[in-house]
Amino acid sequence: MSWQSYVDSFLVGAGKGMGGAIIGLQGGVWAASANCTPSAQESVAIGTACASNIAGLQQTGVVIGGKKYMITRVDADEGTAMGKKGAEGISIYKTKQAVIIGYFSDASVSAGQNSDATYKCAKYLMDAGY
């Protein structure tokens, strides 16, 4: 399966979200949907923050595609973060080698549904050694 197929199958669809991205911990976008594409600089910032101090995201926020999301919840032990920007939101899960970002843009998908879908993608990759 290509990296893009993980985004398409785990992060996009009814009850999952409207998109997402997989980036490396050193930066670099492995796969992304059109509506959730971090720039090269953004992917490095997210990957570095998640690799070193994910709790710091609450102070800095997360920028994806030029949009800044306020981080509302972090669990440093689990390597997770949740963020909002108006009706939009993101779920972030860190694996050994990557950061999985789930994205939703309206009330048709709840933050909980998006977080669950993002977790399932991250868990699948962790079980595969990523």
UniProtKB/Swiss-Prot annotation:
PROSITE patterns per UniProt: PROFILIN (PS00414)
Q: Where does the record say this protein resides?
A: Cytoplasm, Cytoskeleton; Cell projection, Phagocytic cup; Cytoplasmic vesicle, Phagosome
Q: What keywords were assigned to this record?
A: Actin-binding, Cell projection, Cytoplasm, Cytoplasmic vesicle, Cytoskeleton
> What main location does UniProt list?
cytoplasm
Show the Pfam families listed in the entry.
Answer: Profilin (PF00235)
Identify a single GO molecular function assigned to this protein.
actin monomer binding
One Gene Ontology term, aspect cellular component = phagocytic vesicle
Its family remark reads: Belongs to the profilin family.
Description of how the protein assembles with itself and partners: Interacts with actin. Interacts with RHO1 (GTP-bound form).
Query: Main role?
Result: Binds to actin and affects the structure of the cytoskeleton. At high concentrations, profilin prevents the polymerization of actin, whereas it enhances it at low concentrations. By binding to PIP2, it inhibits the formation of IP3 and DG.
What name does this protein carry?
Profilin-1
